[in-house]
Design a protein with these regions (language model features):
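Basic nucleic-acid-binding interfaces
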Residues: 1-3, 18, 45
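Enriched for short, Lys/Arg-rich terminal
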Residues: 1-10, 22-25, 56-61, 66-89
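Surface-exposed, Lys/Arg-rich phosphate-binding patches that contact polyanionic backbones
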Residues: 15-22
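Glycine/serine-rich loop-strand microenvironments at binding/catalytic pocket rims
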Residues: 23-27, 38-40
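A short beta-strand-loop micro-motif that forms or neighbors metal/cofactor-
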Residues: 28, 36, 75
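A short, surface-exposed loop/turn module that caps and links secondary-structure elements
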Residues: 32-55
Length: 89
């Protein structure tokens, strides 16, 4: 089995820094669920993106991410995190 790493964009880290600890814990637990096989959570493939972006729903938050592969390491790159109404703009 490949090793799985999680990387965050600057935008995602900035959003997490503004949340309370409980909310950050919920989001990080959901992102950790992506490392399972099969991934756990309400996941849908996003249309209109050729890089294979997917979205994970956690309550009213949406986590936009994509999978990247580097030799024996699978990377889950978290592109953005935001509220349902603002994340798709």
């Amino acid at each position: 089995m490949n090793e799985v790493k999680i990387r965050y964009s600057k935008d995602a880290l900035k959003f997490l820094s503004k949340l309370d600890k409980r909310s950050v814990g919920r989001i990080r637990d959901a992102i950790t669920g992506l490392t399972c096989n099969p991934p756990v959570g309400d996941i849908k493939t996003m249309q209109g993106y050729s890089d294979g972006r997917k979205r994970l729903r956690v309550g009213s938050w949406r986590i936009i991410y994509r999978h990247e592969n580097e030799e024996t390491v699978e990377i889950i790159f978290v592109i953005d995190i935001g509220n349902r109404g603002n994340i798709y703009k």
